[in-house]
Amino acid sequence: MKTIIAEKPSVAREIARIVGATEREEGYFTGNGYNVTWAFGHLVQPALPEGYGIRGFHPENLPIIPQVFTLVPRQVKTDKGYKADAGVMKQIKVITRLFNECDKIIVATDAGREGELIFRYLYEYIGCATPFDRLWISSLTDKAIREGLKNLECGSKYDNLYYAAKARSEADWLVGINATQAITLAAGRGTYSLGRVQTPTLAMVCKRFWENKRFTPETFHQLHFGTEHKDGTVVKFDSEEKYKDKSAAEELYNKVKGTRSATLTKVVRKEKTEDTPLLYDLTTLQKDANSKHGFTAEQTLAIAQKLYEAKLITYPRTGSRYISEDVFAEIPKLLQTLKNRPVWSLYALSIKKPTRRSVDGSKVTDHHAIIITGELPKHLSNEDMTIYDMIVGRMLEAFSEKCIKDVTQVTADCCGIIFTAKGSVIKKEGWRYIYGADKKDVLLPDDWNEGDTVTVNSSSLTTGQTKPKPLHTEASLLAAMETCGKDIEDDEMRQAIKDCGIGTPATRAAIIETLFARGYVVRADKSLVPTEKGLALYYVVKEMQIADVAMTGEWEQSLAKIERGEMDDRDFRRGIEEYTSLITSELLSCQKIFGHKESECTCPKCGTGKMQFFHKVVRCDNKECGLPIFRQKAGKDLTDDEMKELITNGKTGVLKGFKSKQGKKFSAIVAFDSDFNTQFIFPK
């Protein structure tokens, strides 16, 4: 008898059908020599500190570093603390019996780091010694499952994947437990949550927020002139230089305004080739879905997982944007399946010979890029179809021809001032045919040459301002997590450094959602805005190692090395233990920042707590409320008296000393809105 374990019941049901295990029992299917059972996520996890006899938050217990981690069934929170989930215990009992009674286990959990850990933790907790093989597949179609079952791999082949997963799990426990307890002890009240990846991610959101809010725009002035060619084409030239001095710009403008001609000093024409975009991995799919359709990262992952389980796409939690040669051989057949879908048939038929930019087996690790399986979608919701069509569209783009443009740049001299004009004409649409060109052609006369004189038919002087980097969206935050905050646009360069990012494609959505759940960040349209609680925490930890984005990226790189067999997981464990001790010490030492004064001010939100006055924030002492009111507003720190007035009356009087983004001082009333966030009210 063989036992197959899947990650969730729906997958187990499909596998059971294929192997002929058609009889339903409590917690498994059976028949034809197979038992097919399932987990539902992590059934087993490392024990909380209570599992090692450590209760409560006490500085003398820190850092908590177990010599060996104890595994326990998944816990649920109750009024009396944590206890094992009854449903989990019941399923573990079923799995234990099946594992111990069978001759061979077939591991069919998701083919990735977390899927491996789900099984290995369970196997270790049970104390099982039954040999196991690995079902490693990239889609859940009947064909893929059957081929995978014919080509099972020895379970030990994935030991390094398990070591990396286990190292990640233990590192998150060590950093999360110790950092959370240390900063909570330092604060003296409430509970703050910190994490190995969560905190650097919050730091990126807060840093961008402050860069945006504290940005001082600079005014600039730019000259322009227009000329009309004999064929009727009107071309606009812009001055290369942008002038800070308005009077100097106006003086130059008057010169241009008073002249009738300009001389072309340089005409450069060249052919520009735009490579096809690479196929989607999970992160780029999430970024595009957010920027184009407003989907959250978590929403996109959930839909992609649903499409995968519906056999419509390949494994979504991939970090690769490439496919191997054997998968490429199937692409013509997959494109042919699209001829039955009117929206895509014309585009699919236009691809006579798929191009190879996304084909590189050396850049495929556990799973290749996300592609369709050839199964036809039926009864999908609008949201599900949107993600499916994005994957189809990207496949069509990736296997189309390159886009070729004729690009022209003309430089002109007018009154000693250098002006430029740029033109671009699509010569061959290639992959841009799929969605259409994103910009219209800009035509420049093709008979212009160096030394030619053009007529100045019009001139103008415009004024603009420099702009700050925008607040992070989920799309830009995912990009920053992928590259540790480095601004990299090139697809291939992003792929080259993806091991240095923070988090993994499979975990980044959950990390972002954690920031919302902790009350550190909120959504404002598409933008991510830190709350006062998030900013207050950032202020405390921003210079500490736990908020160091680059260091977190180095840990992720080490985990990738463990997975490839290039690093011993024990060396990683020693390093993370040292790091844990360091950050715990740093966080415990920040008590002075959290020093506070008691007050008799009642919390305006909950009506029961008392407000405590800290250096940078005033906060409610009711643990169920914890309302934070950040002191700094537009470059001004509110005094204790001003804060008391705000808390007591819901608003202050007119206060002076605020400074706008442009650096101008202004006066305003600070008041609460309906959610007890602060806002400015301007006196009439």
Feature locations, PLM:
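Intrinsically disordered, low-complexity regulatory segments
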Residues: 1-169, 173, 350, 468
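Conserved short loop/turn motifs at secondary-structure junctions
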Residues: 1-3, 110-111, 188-191, 269-278, ...
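Basic, low-complexity terminal or inter-domain segments flanking catalytic cores
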Residues: 2, 77, 81, 125, ...
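Amphipathic alpha-helical transducer elements in NTP-driven molecular machines
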Residues: 9-16, 33-36, 40, 59-62, ...
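Accessory interaction regions appended to the cores of large information-processing enzymes
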Residues: 17-23, 47, 53-55, 154, ...
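C-terminal or mid-to-C-terminal helical accessory/interaction module adjacent to the motor/catalytic core
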Residues: 87, 100-101, 142-225, 269-270
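Metal- or metallocofactor-binding catalytic centers and their adjacent structured scaffolds
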Residues: 244-280, 286
